[in-house]
Amino acid sequence: MTTPKILVVEDEIVTRNTLKGIFEAEGYDVFEAENGVEMHHILANHNINLVVMDINLPGKNGLLLARELREELSLPLIFLTGRDNEVDKILGLEIGADDYLTKPFNPRELTIRARNLLHRAMPHQEKENTFGREFYRFNGWKLDLNSHSLITPEGQEFKLPRSEFRAMLHFCENPGKLQTREELLKKMTGRELKPQDRTVDVTIRRIRKHFEDHPNTPNIIMTIHGEGYRFCGDIE
């Protein structure tokens, strides 16, 4: 089995070395970047499986780099940052981060979250879960299981971040069934739901913007107040 490769994007050398040591102790190959230029260079030359990134970086900050990353690749992304206000967390998740941890962090919690994301990112895992399918069709749209993309009725393709793809795959596999936030978060990230965790709601809001004519009054992914969500699309 190929050793997973983790890219740490962090400008503080002490923190970067700490993260490198933590992940290497878990058996991962670790690459380091202190800014966006180095990040893109490493991504272009190595098959990275997970990115762990700070927000406060020299030059382009982590939020801008995450947006660029999402336009190019569908990699698991964890923000690890000293910025702990709710606005930054929601914005990070809106852009497409799969997880968000604040400093100071618990090394054990970080490695567990990283391991869960890597497990769900393995190509064979996606193939096992799709039972030989290449796509799902619903309401004129298509979820491509190979490219992890949503394709419009006109043929335009939108690459989905890992968490959005996992949520959509779960919805398409379970049409019409109530999905609790606990179930969705477990499918998306592998972690348990905690109080005030809005990861699922933010991810659903991003997904709805793709295909709901009126995202605030959706008719494909319905909100079941106090319980969760239900996918009401017409699966073909």
From Swiss-Prot:
Known Pfam families for this protein?
A: Response_reg, Trans_reg_C
The protein's matches in CDD domains, at most eight in alphabetical order, are given as: trans_reg_C
Question: Could you tell me which InterPro entries the record lists for this protein?
Answer: CheY-like_superfamily, OmpR/PhoB-type_DNA-bd, Sig_transdc_resp-reg_C-effctor, Sig_transdc_resp-reg_receiver, WalR-like, WH-like_DNA-bd_sf
Start and end of every Response regulatory domain?
5-118
SUPFAM superfamilies the record matches: C-terminal effector domain of the bipartite response regulators, CheY-like
What does the entry's PTM section describe?
A: Phosphorylated by ArcB.
**Is ATP-binding one of the keywords?**
no
DNA-binding region boundaries? 133-233
The biological processes this protein is annotated with in GO are: regulation of DNA-templated transcription
Q: Where in the cell is it found?
A: Cytoplasm
Keyword DNA-binding belongs to the record: yes
What's a GO cellular component annotated to this UniProt protein? cytosol
Entry-annotated residues carrying 4-aspartylphosphate: D54
User: Which UniProt keyword terms apply here?
Assistant: Activator, Cytoplasm, DNA-binding, Phosphoprotein, Repressor, Transcription, Transcription regulation, Two-component regulatory system
Principal location: cytoplasm
In its UniProt record, a GO molecular function of this protein is: phosphorelay response regulator activity
Q: What does this protein do?
A: Member of the two-component regulatory system ArcB/ArcA. Represses a wide variety of aerobic enzymes under anaerobic conditions.
Q: Which PANTHER family match?
A: AEROBIC RESPIRATION CONTROL PROTEIN ARCA, REGULATOR OF RPOS
Q: What is this protein called?
A: Aerobic respiration control protein ArcA homolog
Name the source organism: Haemophilus influenzae (strain ATCC 51907 / DSM 11121 / KW20 / Rd)
